[in-house]
């Protein structure tokens, strides 16, 4: 685990207080960053249905994932085994079966189907179909938008989080120095970004880096008008500007950095 159990318990209590203030009895969090914040789960499985379910009075949240990824939950979270809920592979790509059928059954079995449920209505990977599944499958619940409840709790960082962000910042600095060194006229963009990525993953002698939530962005020349373009096999041109946007990452904590360089 990247944090102590006490850290996770403190986060849970803050979320539950906000839930109480908003009149939410059960929160279903689909945001992958929120799942990590509440449980420690960080497997690369966001593209399938998964969530953390928080009851306003529970001692621990529930981590709900597909069977294939359940090992990641057992390894990476602080939760008791009984609070890791697994849905079978039969729900994957077998319409009309859907993973949310399983989640709805769990909520019914726990007799939570008459509670006020908060949903992250503007969260990535929570589709309109997922919402309809919940609305139709739990007709006796009151559904409401959680309004980025967990995200707002996350805004105030703990000392432990800030320590990780400072480490990520050092990796960002190293990656940016590499970028400025390797971006030169006549160099292929892909070659430059390869060196940048290498630097970001190598990290420092004290701590290694890891993949980031954003690709290294490297728009150059007229591409600078588009901001979010990635490297191609084209070469850098003397007299043109290049925007560098990257982030060092340490234990999933980012510290992004952006700079503009002019060649020549």
Locate the predicted segments by residue:
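Conserved short loop/turn motifs at secondary-structure junctions
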Residues: 118-123, 180-189
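Short alpha-helical functional segments enriched in proximate histidine and acidic residues
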Residues: 18, 22, 175, 179-182, ...
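A composition/biophysics-driven feature that prefers long, compositionally simple stretches
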Residues: 1-174
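Active-site pocket-lining segments that scaffold enzyme catalytic pockets across diverse folds
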Residues: 169-172, 176-179, 189, 197
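Short amphipathic alpha-helical leader/targeting segments
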Residues: 54, 179, 253-254
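Short catalytic-site patches enriched in acidic/histidine residues
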Residues: 35-45, 147-152, 156, 187-264
